[in-house]
Amino acid sequence: MKDIPVFTTDDGVASLALQQIPHTGFAHITVHSASAFSDFLQECVGFCRTVGAERIFACGHKDLEQYPIYARVLSMQMPIPEDVEQACLFPVTVESLDKWLDIYNTGMKDVPNAVALSKQAGKELVEKGTAYFVHENGNVLGIGVVEDDTVRAIVSCQKGAGELVMNSLFGALCGDIVKVEVAENNGPAINLYQRMGFVTTGILKTWYDVTKIF
């Protein structure tokens, strides 16, 4: 299943994130413009259902506020601490990508607003050098995605290792501030970030549940 970056009809333009349908049954619609919003939303939702989506969420238009909120995506940040315990970082390679993707997609399966990654998406991360394993004493503690000053994703493979995995990913960051993006209803992640000292700086995006619009 492939995403559709530009989905167009006579009524509007949107991006459809469909890659997670085989994993979670979820589809995400980002509306870019709409001349007839209600009609266009129905067209988008109808298409997502046709390709197998069981839950459908949308963002990007003020008229979506009439629908139930599924998730607000928060921006959080903190100064990068000094002298914290860190494990070893290993960049993901083409040879280790399958293992990394398996950990990522398994760990993200039940995370609110998370998107499953395809093999092609994984290859793009490898090319950019932004995907990592976190190891300690030969054991995989977790994985992550780091871009510039932002930790884009983190998965802990061992109970209680989340803080160590995050601290280790700090080593791949640029600058003195670390940022994360997290769904407001992702309780475990919010609790981890707050315990570490992250503070909320804003709402980046609000997803609305449009599964039952017609």
Question: Predicted segments — roles?
Answer:
Residues 152-153, 178-181:
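Conserved active-site loop/cleft motifs that coordinate metal ions or position small ligands
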Residues 31-87, 180, 204-208:
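Acyl-donor-binding surface of acyltransferase catalytic domains
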Residues 54, 176-178, 199:
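Short acidic/polar active-site loop segments enriched in Thr and Asp
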Residues 34-47, 158-173, 190-195:
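Conserved acetyl-CoA-binding loop-helix of GNAT-fold acetyltransferases
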Residues 1-8, 110-137:
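Active-site rim helix/loop that mediates acceptor-substrate recognition in acyltransferases
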Residues 1-6, 84-114:
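Short amphipathic alpha-helix that is part of the acyltransferase structural core
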Residues 1-43, 136-158:
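Conserved donor-binding loop and adjoining core beta-sheet/short helix segment
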Residues 61-72, 163, 185-203:
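Conserved active-site alpha-helix within GNAT-family acetyltransferase domains
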